[in-house]
Amino acid sequence: TDMSTYDKYPQRDLITKWRLIKKDPPAELSEPVEPIVFWVDKATPEEIKPMVVKGIEVWNLAYERAGFKNAVVAKIQPDDSDWDAGDIQYNVVRWSSSPEPGFSGYGPSIGNPRTGELIAADRVQEFNAIKRGYNYRKLWGWTPENDPLEQWIISLTMHEVGHTIGLRHNFSASYLYGPREVHDKSITGNTTIASIMDYDPINIAPPGLEQGNYFPTEPGEYDRWAIEFAYKPNLTDEERAELLALSVLPAYRYGTDGDAMGTPGRNIDPRTRRGDMSNDVVTYTADRFITLDNKIAELPEIYSDEGETKNDFTNSFYSLVSDKGRFMDIVAGQVGLSLIHISEPTRP
């Protein structure tokens, strides 16, 4: 709270961020004097390690917008290392196996309260998330070019790393592409949403459409914009104003935890909520129901191999039925609500 202002709302939102200094200050693109280094826990399964590395280092695409090359570096903890993954001297992506995990991961960090400089961070990701990824493969199929397990782990890692470099949730990010556009890689590139900081469901194409990305594997346009605003050195007032002016465009819409529509009576903008997809959730849900119903009918065949258990079948069945329930709830939330235009105070 800014006690030196006479504004009606004196609250100010401040980002915590890492200290990045260019080796070559005049250069448009320069490596930092000290990069942000994240370690991958040596206990990470071998197949998963390169996915986690990519989920870390792909953030360099956003930092290049801010003028930094190789700002984020991923290293794999050596098998013979004598330091613990919980050592605060190392920023580590490590794994937990909780009995009933509430989240697939979380990304806490430690900042200097006087300056806002981040000095340490950890990402804890649940082993249950890896199991979920393998189940995605079993249910939806995969190829080396379009692997839901790989995309899920990259996406999850990106999201948690995003928290540890200063970004909050953005639950408006899914409201960017149309319900058919979101399956078209020529439109979405390597994303499905405007920001990796949303909670997005697996993106499944309906019958008749080619499968696009299951999950985003690069920072979205909002992420690149936010990192540029936060980390670009020596922004002039004019440059800062130009960046802020973009906030009214669809790719830069923002709504975080306090804005997200949830249980009845909590917030009123249906575009800002967890677990939805596309800017026409009614059409997307109708498409998804067809896909889910078809997959439910296929479950007996999918789980007919020797060694498959009734428990595997039942878990997948309830998962698919629950997915239908979540999307019905999202559709119901479209009725009788209001759109909030945070960056457009004169708009009705």
PLM segments and residue spans:
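The catalytic-center signature of Zn2+-dependent metalloproteases
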Residues: 76-97, 151-207
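Short conserved micro-motifs at the rims of enzyme active sites and ligand-binding pockets
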Residues: 50, 105, 134, 206-212
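Auxiliary tRNA-acceptor-end handling modules of aminoacyl-tRNA synthetases
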Residues: 1-44, 62, 66, 77-149, ...
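Stable alpha-helical elements in mature extracytoplasmic
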Residues: 48-55, 149, 153, 157
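Zn2+-dependent metallopeptidase catalytic core
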Residues: 43-71
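Conserved catalytic/binding loops enriched for acidic/polar residues
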Residues: 174-343, 347
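Polar, glycine-rich mid-to-C-terminal structural blocks
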Residues: 117-156, 211-247
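Sec-exported extracytoplasmic/periplasmic mature domains
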Residues: 57-68, 162-163, 167, 202, ...
